[in-house]
């Protein structure tokens, strides 16, 4: 029997968990938000996009908050909610897909870090896939591995400091753009209906809204950070508070960051600024020192988010293995109660993926799009479980959240999750199914060696495996015959 160390320490409070949520959501992409939003929409459509996204993500955030309160026994909820509600195979598949998603996402942080360094040391790290960039990224993969090995609490403390440090440049950006804000400029072509010599018509408000929401929907990936770490939280209440605090804080920052520049620069000017566009905006408004500050902030943001996701990504297989869904070897801890084997295996897979970046940038970009879609079923399954549990007689109606509230929160979160999956791209979803099917042998292996073989291989679980395998084969056929193209 493999020893998995002592009982998991519950030493993360609301602040540490909120730092995890904010840091996992606010990565390097936020420093490109002004240009990304202005590229296809006017200020009016951007406001509508944030309102709709904010409402949708509120229901997802509230889903996690409610579940942490009414089912505090289910730790690392992003995986456990799926397992509890829909059986071991769905739980495994959600955990497997989420794990793969974050492995590739972390390597994306490595690429972005090296590319950001190129601003200070051109041309050695250009594109993030040169030999110096691969070496630098590989070193950082293992540096973060050893930081987390020192202990989750210590890593979380470093992450809180990093979160504060990356919010400072963003706060300075908000203050400067607010200082230069002119309402007359902001109101100019508010709905994006005027063409210029360099900028064609943006189209209807509906088309602007659709293209802009493709940006906003990814802004909140990571909202589940506190839930994933709930096994190490001081209390279920801390998980709920951290999720809502992180969501609210990020939404405010996103809205201000994407709208305030419209008060000092016109839409076509913002759309033409090179990324990271926060640096370009400050270069125009205050000079080169502003550009340098934003590029430093970009580096801090990426590194801080990378640390957060290193903690989170190792926690998924560790937690899944503790109840037998992943191979038992993932449960091994070190003296600091960090998931040692899970960290080493995860970092090794990241290292392999980092080497692949050197050979094929285009294939890597496609892989990031595919794995980005793979996180969304976890949101859908969690919301669906809340709907299911709200109808259960065991639901604690005497608690702070009534079943009626839980039910309709879950329903609205389900609807928004389905929209996210659709907007993410059906072709990427098909490829994601292929990657999910690759986990089937690991599920079978875990089932054979676990105590719950009958449950793992019950008729309904075999049916689910068969459906995923069939869909994966169908996807391979569609791609090989070019009926669907990436």
UniProtKB/Swiss-Prot annotation:
**What's this protein's function?**
Catalyzes the exchange of L-arginine for agmatine. The arginine uptake by the bacterium in the macrophage may be a virulence factor against the host innate immune response.
**Keywords assigned by UniProt?**
Amino-acid transport, Antiport, Cell inner membrane, Cell membrane, Membrane, Transmembrane, Transmembrane helix, Transport, Virulence
Q: Where are the transmembrane segments?
A: 12-32, 41-61, 85-105, 129-149, 161-181, 211-231, 242-262, 296-316, 341-361, 367-387, 418-438, 461-481
- What topology in the membrane does the UniProt record assign? Multi-pass membrane protein
Give the source species: Chlamydia felis (strain Fe/C-56) (Chlamydophila felis)
Q: Read off the InterPro entries from this record.
A: AA/rel_permease1, Amino_acid_antiprt, APC_superfamily
The answer, when asked if Membrane is one of the entry's keywords, is yes
Task: Output the GO biological process annotations, alphabetical, semicolon-separated.
Answer: amino acid transport
Q: What protein am I looking at?
A: Arginine/agmatine antiporter
């Amino acid at each position: 029997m493999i020893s998995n160390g002592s009982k998991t320490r519950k030493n993360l409070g609301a602040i540490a968990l909120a730092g995890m949520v904010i840091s996992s959501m606010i990565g390097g992409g936020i420093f490109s938000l002004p240009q990304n939003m202005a590229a296809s929409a006017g200020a009016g459509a951007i406001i509508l996009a944030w309102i709709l996204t904010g409402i949708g993500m509120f229901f997802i955030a509230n889903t996690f908050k409610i579940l942490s309160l009414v089912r505090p026994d289910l730790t690392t909820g992003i995986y456990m909610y799926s397992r509890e509600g829909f059986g071991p195979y769905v739980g495994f598949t959600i955990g497997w897909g989420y794990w793969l998603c974050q492995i590739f996402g972390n390597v994306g942080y490595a690429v972005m870090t090296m590319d950001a360094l190129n601003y200070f040391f051109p041309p050695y790290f250009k594109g993030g896939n040169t030999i110096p960039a691969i070496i630098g990224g590989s070193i950082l993969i293992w540096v973060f591995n050893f930081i987390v090995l020192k202990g989750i609490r210590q890593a979380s403390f470093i992450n809180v400091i990093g979160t504060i440090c990356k919010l400072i440049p963003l706060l300075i950006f908000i203050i400067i753009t607010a200082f230069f804000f002119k309402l007359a400029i902001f109101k100019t072509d508010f709905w994006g209906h005027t063409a210029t010599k360099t900028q064609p018509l943006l189209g209807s408000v509906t088309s602007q809204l659709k293209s802009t929401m493709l940006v906003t929907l990814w802004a909140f990936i990571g909202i589940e950070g506190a839930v994933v770490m709930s096994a190490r939280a001081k209390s279920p209440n801390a998980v709920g508070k951290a999720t809502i605090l992180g969501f609210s804080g990020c939404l405010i920052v996103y809205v201000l960051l994407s709208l305030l520049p419209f008060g000092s620069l016109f839409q076509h000017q913002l759309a033409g600024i090179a990324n990271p566009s926060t640096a370009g905006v400050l270069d125009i408004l205050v000079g080169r020192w502003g550009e340098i500050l934003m590029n430093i902030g970009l580096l801090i943001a990426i590194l801080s988010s990378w640390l957060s996701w290193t903690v989170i990504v190792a926690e998924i297989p560790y937690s899944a293995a503790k109840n037998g869904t992943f191979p038992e070897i993932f449960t091994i801890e070190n003296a600091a109660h960090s998931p040692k084997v899970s960290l080493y295996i995860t970092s090794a897979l990241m290292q392999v993926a980092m080497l692949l970046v050197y050979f094929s940038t285009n294939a890597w970009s496609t892989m990031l799009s595919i794995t980005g879609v793979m996180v969304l079923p976890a949101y859908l399954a969690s919301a669906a479980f809340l709907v299911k549990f709200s109808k259960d007689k065991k639901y604690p109606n005497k608690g702070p959240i009534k079943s009626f509230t839980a039910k309709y929160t879950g329903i609205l979160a389900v609807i928004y999750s389905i929209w996210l999956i659709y907007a993410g791209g059906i072709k990427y979803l098909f490829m994601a199914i292929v990657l999910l099917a690759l986990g089937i042998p690991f599920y079978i292996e875990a089932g054979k060696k676990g105590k719950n073989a009958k449950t793992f291989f019950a008729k309904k679980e075999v049916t689910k495996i068969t459906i995923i395998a069939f869909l994966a084969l169908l996807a391979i056929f569609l791609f090989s015959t070019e009926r669907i193209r990436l």
